[in-house]
């Protein structure tokens, strides 16, 4: 007997099945490892692209703060100093070394591509086409990110949002800008990366859930390590590394959960369309 909760129960059942089948916890761990290897090459490429566009000079500092805060919300200053040092060292590398760093950055994009296509159960792209897609993401991604942050910075500086016009809701609106940017970023990832046409509504729904978990998770993570700083007693000066690993693991898990939610919505819609088509065929046969 069907009730109002039957669709939700069916969705939950399929979601849990796919969560186990796709081994999202293991996938999140693999992406965390790939991110740790590729974070310096990726940031180096991003800032190199930014340096080619003078319009982004004023945004670079904001972008650094954005990246470091999201990669390691508990120790963004320390992580930022180390990564700045690594990036400075990378400028002394030869052409072969720079190419190797770019390859490592492309490998991270490949890992993300494989994980998301595995969730949607889509076939792999051809090698040349995959390289073209990855290179486009690596080159255009930072530009899109820079434009988004530039717009966010511009909006922040508007008198309306600074509250200079005595509009109290301005500050509240301003607080949603990072969340909206995160939501839009996840939506684009879910809509573009899988090797199939994705329903944009489903991608946005999954991205919304991922953005909520990501935002709340970051706040909860910062609260925990501030309230219970026992990790510093255990790891001492090395405390930044395990914290960064833990947050990266959680971040990728949130992103994969949102992707899985969008994929299940696509799967359910496909099943419903097939049922409707079957009913239409049966009705025609009866006539």
UniProtKB/Swiss-Prot annotation:
**Where located?**
Cell inner membrane
Q: Name one Pfam family in it.
A: Virul_fac_BrkB
One GO CC annotation: plasma membrane
Its membrane topology is listed as: Multi-pass membrane protein
| Segments crossing the lipid bilayer | 36-56, 93-113, 131-151, 173-193, 205-225, 237-257
Q: Which cysteines are joined by disulfide bonds?
A: none
Entry keyword set: Cell inner membrane, Cell membrane, Membrane, Transmembrane, Transmembrane helix
User: Cross-referenced InterPro entries, in alphabetical order?
Assistant: UPF0761_bac (IPR023679), Virul_fac_BrkB (IPR017039)
Provide the family line: Belongs to the UPF0761 family.
This protein is called UPF0761 membrane protein Asuc_0342
Its lineage opens with:
Bacteria, Pseudomonadati, Pseudomonadota, Gammaproteobacteria, Pasteurellales
């Amino acid at each position: 007997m069907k009730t109002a909760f039957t669709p939700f129960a069916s969705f939950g059942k399929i979601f849990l099945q796919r969560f186990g089948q796709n081994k999202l916890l293991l996938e999140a761990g693999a992406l965390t490892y790939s991110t740790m290897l590729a974070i310096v090459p990726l940031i180096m490429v991003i800032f190199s692209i930014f340096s080619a566009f003078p319009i982004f000079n004023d945004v670079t500092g904001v972008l650094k703060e954005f990246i470091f805060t999201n990669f390691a919300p508990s120790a963004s200053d320390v992580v930022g100093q180390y990564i700045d040092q690594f990036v400075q060292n990378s400028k002394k590398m030869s052409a072969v070394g720079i190419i190797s760093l770019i390859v490592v950055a492309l490998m991270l994009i490949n890992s993300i591509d494989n994980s998301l296509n595995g969730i949607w159960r889509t076939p792999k792209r051809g090698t040349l086409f995959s390289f073209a897609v990855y290179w486009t993401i690596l080159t255009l991604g930072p530009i899109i990110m820079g434009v988004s942050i530039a717009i966010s910075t511009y909006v922040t500086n508007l008198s309306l949002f600074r509250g200079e016009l005595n509009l109290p809701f301005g500050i509240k609106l301003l607080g949603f800008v990072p969340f909206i940017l995160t939501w839009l970023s996840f939506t684009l990832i879910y809509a573009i990366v899988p090797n199939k046409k994705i329903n944009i509504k489903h991608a946005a729904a999954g991205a919304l859930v991922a953005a909520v978990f990501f935002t709340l998770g970051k706040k909860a993570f910062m609260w925990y390590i501030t309230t219970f700083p026992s990790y510093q007693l255990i790891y001492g000066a090395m405390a930044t590394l395990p914290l960064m690993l833990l947050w990266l693991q959680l971040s990728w898990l949130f992103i994969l959960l949102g992707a899985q939610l969008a994929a299940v919505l696509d799967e359910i819609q496909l099943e419903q369309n097939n049922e409707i088509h079957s009913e239409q065929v049966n009705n025609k046969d009866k006539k």
